[in-house]
């Protein structure tokens, strides 16, 4: 439904990242389990500097590095929208949509209703990094070296999990192995 509203308001003249970002952001507002959520992989993308700059976010959908990066583009777009709303208000989004409908380029519309892109990018990076660092702070998100634990040896993984009970990789792998055995 959100796509219908935004596309009508912009006369179908809006970049995919902004359309998807608004929709995923709205999904999360409606219900916390809806929409793209932070994941260990997204956390790593953010902390490893793999976010696409806001001014080039359309490229994340057009030429992604991998299928995972396409999914991350949805999430990143939604947190850009979240950042805009938190820092510049909901009117900022509405004003950008209006300008897009008048043929204004997205980056110009953002600068007119939020901040210069360089300053916006700086603030957004701090915001996204904060979200990433706050994600599962008690979890061990490191993937062990294959020499440390053989990823093909189910018993070795269980043993390693017993020694590292908060390790997400070991938990996920053990669960997947148990499901496979069923």
List the model feature ranges, each with a label.
Residues 1-6, 22:
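Active-site His/Glu-centered metal-binding helix of metallohydrolases
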Residues 145-155, 179-182:
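Helix-turn-helix repeat elements of alpha-solenoid scaffolds
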Residues 158-162:
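A conserved position within tetratricopeptide repeats
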Residues 9-151:
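Acidic/His/Gly-enriched intrinsically disordered linker/tail segments
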């Amino acid at each position: 439904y959100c796509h219908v509203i935004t596309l009508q308001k912009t006369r179908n003249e809006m970049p995919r990242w902004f359309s998807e970002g608004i929709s995923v952001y709205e999904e999360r507002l409606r219900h916390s389990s809806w929409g793209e959520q932070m994941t260990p992989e997204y956390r790593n993308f953010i902390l490893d500097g793999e976010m696409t700059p806001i001014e080039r976010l359309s490229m994340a959908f057009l030429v992604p590095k991998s299928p995972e990066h396409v999914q991350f583009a949805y999430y990143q777009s939604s947190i850009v929208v979240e950042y805009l709303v938190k820092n510049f208000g909901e009117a900022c989004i509405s004003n950008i949509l209006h300008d897009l409908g008048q043929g204004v380029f997205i980056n110009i519309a953002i600068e007119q209703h939020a901040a210069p892109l360089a300053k916006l990018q700086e603030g957004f990076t701090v915001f996204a990094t904060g979200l990433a660092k706050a994600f599962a702070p008690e979890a061990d998100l490191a993937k062990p070296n294959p020499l440390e634990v053989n990823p093909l040896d189910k018993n070795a993984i269980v043993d390693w999990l017993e020694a590292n009970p908060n390790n997400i990789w070991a938990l996920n792998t053990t669960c997947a192995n148990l499901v496979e055995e069923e």
